[in-house]
Regions:
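Low-complexity, glycine/alanine/serine/threonine- and acidic/polar-rich repeat/linker tracts characteristic
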Residues: 1-11, 15-34, 38-41, 45-55, ...
Length: 209
């Protein structure tokens, strides 16, 4: 009877362990998917903050990454550039003189999408042959992040457009419509992870002495 009882306990323990492994596996996969959802959710929120589209920002992130610029640096640079371009269009701000020096019109520049604004800048940068002047202008446009973006702008108009096309071909450009869906999916996934965590806690409590 004792042996039969021990056998039953052992079987129960192994069943519980199998269930725990299954839950852990689901949780592990869940966090992997959650990481991807978080990245897209962050892209959408950052694009909204800057006042641009997820298409433009995701393409710019790819071009920046390929020229050695980290995502957070690019995002901050775009926030500052957007604000400074708006100020320049009103005839004020740090970027006013720099935009004029590049031969661009701040009002026309502001009406373009963010990625096309950068294409215009990249084209104009090609006419600035002195490295010190390039750095100085970049600082006026992007503040302290300007130094990092010099290499991105050095791609030129055609080079930057090529990067955008490559990002699209690789499926790295996220549409606004898709990003809205991801925001909703992220909320639903948070609920699912909470349920999984609850199951793990219940199993752990059941195994406790």
């Amino acid at each position: 009877a004792v042996g039969k009882s021990l056998k039953g306990v052992t079987s129960a323990i192994f069943s519980m362990r199998t269930a725990l492994v299954g839950v852990a596996g689901v949780a592990g996969f869940g966090y992997l998917v959650k990481s991807s959802l978080n990245a897209t959710d962050s892209l959408k929120k950052t694009a909204d903050k800057i006042g641009t589209t997820t298409e433009a920002l995701s393409a710019l992130r790819y071009a920046a990454e390929r020229t050695g610029v980290q995502t957070n640096t690019l995002d901050m640079a775009m926030q500052r550039f957007t604000r400074r371009t708006a100020e320049a269009a009103k005839g004020t701000g740090e970027a006013k003189g720099a935009i004029k020096e590049l031969g661009l019109d701040a009002n026309k520049l502001q009406r373009l999408s963010l990625d096309q604004q950068m294409v215009s800048l990249a084209g104009a940068f090609g006419n600035v042959t002195n490295d010190a002047d390039r750095l100085r202008i970049a600082f006026k446009l992007f503040d302290s992040e300007g130094a990092a973006l010099v290499n991105t702008l050095a791609l030129g108009e055609a080079g930057l457009e090529e990067m955008f096309g490559r990002a699209k071909t690789l499926g790295l450009v996220m549409s606004n419509q898709a990003s809205v869906g991801v925001e909703k999916a992220n909320d639903s996934f948070n609920d699912m992870l909470s349920i999984v965590k609850g199951l793990k806690d219940q199993f752990s409590a059941a195994l406790a002495p």
